[in-house]
A protein has these predicted regions:
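Mid-length scaffold segments of soluble, non-membrane domains
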Residues: 79-139
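Bacterial N-terminal signal peptides
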Residues: 9-18
Length: 203
């Protein structure tokens, strides 16, 4: 029978390859949009921060995107997904690199590459930017959420979170898609149990 240490090592290696490099709470960074600027985290666990200035054209673009979601919470979540995609395409202007999907083993410390701490922190900063401009009608921004701690068979993973008028929380997880791709938006209650290494760690 494999030793406990060997099993733990395999779990840790699998988690590092498929999930977050760090178990740091992404909410601790406190990054928000200050005026028209957002500090974009990258390099894994927010090692680097690059300032992105969102101008008047960006504000109009976000307003147009979110206007399409005013009819219902479901429509707004779809609009939020499009807003995240646009925001990520803008972040490339300051990182200079197109972030690959998920976390690549060995990419820690590489400028422009993002783990789930970077992704969830950046997404929350955007959501707060939208909220401050009253572009969100059906949702408010909640604290980021985390799941997994290796010993339960899951890799560490973080996500941004929104809450609808009924109090239901929704994960806004941009980690799985490449930069500019649509984030996964699903009930947080469904997001929390996912991420078992036995299933490939990519569900």
């Amino acid at each position: 029978m494999p030793s406990f240490q060997r099993v733990l090592s395999l779990i840790l290696l699998g988690g590092l390859a498929a999930g977050c490099v760090s178990g740091v709470d992404s909410g601790r960074y406190g990054i928000e949009a200050v005026g028209r600027q957002i500090d974009v985290c990258h390099g894994y666990s927010c090692k680097y921060r690059s300032k992105l200035t969102l101008g008047a054209a960006d504000t109009r673009r976000f307003a147009s995107i979110l206007a399409a979601g005013q009819k219902s919470p479901q429509a707004e979540r779809a609009a939020i997904a499009r807003a995240v995609s646009y925001f990520e395409s803008r972040t490339r202007a300051v990182t200079g690199v197109r972030d690959e999907p998920q976390s690549k083993f060995g990419a820690s410390g590489v400028r422009g590459q993002m783990d789930c701490v970077d992704e969830s922190t950046n997404t929350r900063a955007l959501l707060l930017y939208l909220e401050k401009r009253r572009l969100l009608r059906h949702h408010t921004v909640a604290r980021n959420a985390s799941r997994g701690f290796f010993l339960d068979g899951r890799y560490l993973h973080n996500t941004a979170v929104i809450r609808d008028a009924r109090g239901v929380k929704w994960a806004v997880d941009s980690w799985y898609a490449p930069m500019g791709g649509a984030p996964d938006i699903l009930p947080l209650s469904q997001w929390m149990p996912r991420g078992f290494l036995s299933s490939g760690a990519l569900n």
